[in-house]
């Protein structure tokens, strides 16, 4: 474990470097240093929830500097606009291995104006996406990025899209909801993003059919435990702790928040705030949060180990790798995931 005073000094120096004047090229060049510092900080004993929040905070700072620098270079239209963080970035739950999920919202008074404004924003958004990729944030394979015309929209266009997803949900709509409904204003006119969230919650609270479909969709992820409560491995003798671990808590937190009208997008805050609203016992809430945090910690530890070995860091964990205590806690954490799914079945009559 690194010396705490050394870590503090590195962190202070890095924050100063991130705040110092410089070109977008200078900012991108800081990315490896940010990543190295984060590996050391996370390895110093932080729990999973605190570690992913710390990673997201540093990534936010780097991203905002890139956006602000490029906004000064481009001829942007004189309208209110905001860069939206989506998915794990929106939730403040990023791990070391992450790609981009983002969008852009702007103000326009008509569809014709929206088309004209979008044409001016797209070159800027596309360069931001590319510079973020240069800094280590991989381009989204599903093209959910602000540089895609489909996700560079006026407020009215976003509103119509959200209404379509909630009122007439299809499989693709449910998939999009798992990314876009975790939106967080990151840079610019935050009130545009907050107003969009207000609209979203007003619809989801009043649409039980959508809540039911979201809950049913979340239950498709099967907790990797045998009937006897032992770890169930895939054909590679691994467990995908993202798809069949942390995602279960993320999906459940989102559903509970959209049902209760909770504004938070962070999973822990959603589980605690929405859980209180719907009457989840405090002990049950604490168990869910502790389990989620432990699974995140294991994912981060696996990514660090694979990065040190110069391998590709994925979400799969070979359960023989953790200490016996970690293995036992993983089993208990997955049992909490199963209990959370049972809670969804009960609440939504599934």
Q: Where is each model-derived feature located?
A:
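Alpha-helical scaffolding flanking metal-ion-dependent phosphate/phosphodiester catalytic sites
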Residues: 161, 167-182, 248-257, 296-301
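Conserved catalytic core of two-metal-ion nucleotidyltransferases
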Residues: 30-39, 52-65, 73-80, 114-178, ...
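Feature representing long, continuous alpha-helical segments
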Residues: 104, 126, 130, 246-250, ...
């Amino acid at each position: 474990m690194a010396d705490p005073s050394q870590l503090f000094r590195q962190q202070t120096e890095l924050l100063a470097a991130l705040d110092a004047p410089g070109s977008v090229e200078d900012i991108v060049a800081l990315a490896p240093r940010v990543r190295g510092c984060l590996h050391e900080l996370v390895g110093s004993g932080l729990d999973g929830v605190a570690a992913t929040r710390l990673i997201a905070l540093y990534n936010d700072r780097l991203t905002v500097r890139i956006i602000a620098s490029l906004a000064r270079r481009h001829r942007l239209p004189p309208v209110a606009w905001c860069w939206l963080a989506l998915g794990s970035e929106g939730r403040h739950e990023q791990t070391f291995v992450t790609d981009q999920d983002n969008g852009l919202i702007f103000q326009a008074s008509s569809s014709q104006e929206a088309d004209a404004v979008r044409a001016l924003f797209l070159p800027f958004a596309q360069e931001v996406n590319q510079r973020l990729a240069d800094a280590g944030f991989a381009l989204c394979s599903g093209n959910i990025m602000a540089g895609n015309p489909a996700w560079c929209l006026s407020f009215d266009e976003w509103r119509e899209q959200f209404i379509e997803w909630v009122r007439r949900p299809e499989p693709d709509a449910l998939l999009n909801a798992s990314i876009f409904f975790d939106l967080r204003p990151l840079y610019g006119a935050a009130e545009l993003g907050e107003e969009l969230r207000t609209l979203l919650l007003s619809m989801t609270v009043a649409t039980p059919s959508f809540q039911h479909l979201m809950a049913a969709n979340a239950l498709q992820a099967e907790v990797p435990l045998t009937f006897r409560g032992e770890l169930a491995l895939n054909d590679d003798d691994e467990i995908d702790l993202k798809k069949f671990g942390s995602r279960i808590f993320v999906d459940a937190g989102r559903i509970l928040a959209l049902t209760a009208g909770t504004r938070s997008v962070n999973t822990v805050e959603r589980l605690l705030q929405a859980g209180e609203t719907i009457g989840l016992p405090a002990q049950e809430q604490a168990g869910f949060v502790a389990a989620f945090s432990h699974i995140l910690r294991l994912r981060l530890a696996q990514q660090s180990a694979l990065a040190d070995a110069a391998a590709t860091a994925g979400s799969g964990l070979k359960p023989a790798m953790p200490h016996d205590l970690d293995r036992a806690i993983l089993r208990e954490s997955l049992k909490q995931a199963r209990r959370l799914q049972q809670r969804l079945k009960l609440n939504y009559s599934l």
